[in-house]
Amino acid sequence: TLLYTPPPTAMLLGVALIGYTSAKLDGRFFLPYFVAIVKSADIGAYCLGTLFAKSPMGSHKFVPEISPKKSIEGLIGGVLLSLSVGILGALYLPNVSDAMLILGSNISGNIEVGRIVGAAIISLILCLLSIVGDLVESIWKRDSGIKDSGSYIPGMGGILDVADSLLLAAPFMYAITLTLSRF
């Protein structure tokens, strides 16, 4: 499983370093923005999924053969929280806001609406990629007969379980950051 982590990790560093090569973007804002969107998908999924699992209504399993605890309610919670974080970041983080203006002006005639729509699209794609990354890592663990990928982070299953949602989303964020740096 260590073979698939270096390229996305390098792309995370690329997101942070693009700011040094572009006068328009500052990667110091894009890296936390990216991580906040992706991890908020994890947090939203966990919170809403757990809430519904404990409720009388119960939860509806998403992909029980891959990851038995994942639910549709958790998926919805992850999408909603990551959209909220992405839009708020696009509105209030100085450099991210400027980049979303670039994106927004290409999406809509109304720059503010375009900024929000651009942030929502990026956030939704990052959220979905983070979910797929989590599922891919779960498949690899199940194929290897491993339940937890380590004990460095108690209660979370290990380092790879924390990083899995970042692995597929990192290349997309790198491409977006690189593209926006050229405008």
Name every feature range the model reports, one short phrase each:
Residues 1-168:
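Interhelical loop and helix-boundary elements at the membrane-water interface
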Residues 175-183:
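Juxtamembrane boundary at the C-terminal end of a transmembrane helix
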